[in-house]
């Protein structure tokens, strides 16, 4: 299986959107649907699903996931981590949609009430320490040992090195897109990512793209679809 760095994944994403012309919102919808597929195929307690969303494209994935779950009749809470007014346009577009669905954002959520947490705070773009307040929240969530599905990359994990950027939310399952990330296979990142599932959401790679690592045999701990 081909592994990529965070920078390589960003290049592939940019190529798909800017050169090929694939709308970002289409990729977000496909990413969200792939997570819904994993939720439906797994044995998760879906009594109360808490979606934690950040301010970037990973957060936009989270908003779309919450909408799809809500439309299917699940008890879902959507909580933003950060000031929504500073969110990317992709997030704001998703917010406009969920408002029309009638899904109201939660100002604050109790982790103890959640039976499943969807981690859509930070994806592969994380390259600095998490803010102190977010580190505290993550440590509290880890302490109560809730089942977590991470979207693309567990929050706090460097997608290239596998290092923890201050604190990291421990995932039962990580649904990552396009290619598996090096950081999800190395160091503590491999442990905190849990079961990694690679989903094809339509990202296109340039024919002359030079990967930093050679293609490897598929690992038994990684599923692809």
UniProtKB/Swiss-Prot annotation:
Extract the GO molecular function terms from the UniProt entry: metal ion binding; mRNA binding; NAD(P)HX epimerase activity; nucleotide binding
PROSITE patterns cross-referenced by the UniProt entry: YJEF_N
GO CC annotations on file: P-body
In its UniProt entry, the species of origin is given as Leuconostoc kimchii (strain IMSNU 11154 / KCTC 2386 / IH25)
| Reaction catalysis annotation | (6R)-NADHX = (6S)-NADHX; (6R)-NADPHX = (6S)-NADPHX
Q: What is the primary gene name for this protein?
A: nnrE
What's its EC? 5.1.99.6
Domain annotation YjeF N-terminal: ranges: 9-209
Protein name as annotated: NAD(P)H-hydrate epimerase
